[in-house]
């Protein structure tokens, strides 16, 4: 919100031929948060996201928390068995998934004992596998943005120790283990990186670290603090 207020017309994100300003990113996050609540998300419930490093994945790093939810990003390289286990363990209320991964997600849905969640399709027109895939959701991501209220009054967490995200190991040594991050930890991670990297205001960051790995090491939040420019690569 601070970056939106101070630097609304600075570029926030570039992905192929798509470019956003910070005022546009903030507006989309507000609308996404509102849309998530409108389709049933309640405080403390999990939103699972299976997507590559795209603008939608970046927006989810902020919007899910703004809606009071807990973000669960899943490794896009996992097999259907492992994804099904994560569905059962995390019990998400909503799944946001890139249609480029619909095949493995569909297999996971058939195997999972827990599928009581709404599915939102991210259709990436710049990626052939995503653009040509068959949607599996009740809404598209852009429909959810349109459903959202641009004047949505998002709330800060009641407590700094409230959960902000739920991350899982990849299960290489057995079943995946879930780890809950809190808002305080996410804030300190983002703030601590700035002096450690000797970062200045308005940096440009090529996002090569997958955002499903520890929320991209918190760099999305760091770039929000610094009003930087993120370049996404799928």
Explain the meaning of each model-derived region.
Residues 47, 64, 95, 163, ...:
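Conserved S/T- and glycine-rich ATP-binding loop of Class I adenylate-forming
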Residues 38-39, 66-143:
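Structural core segment of the AMP-binding/adenylate-forming
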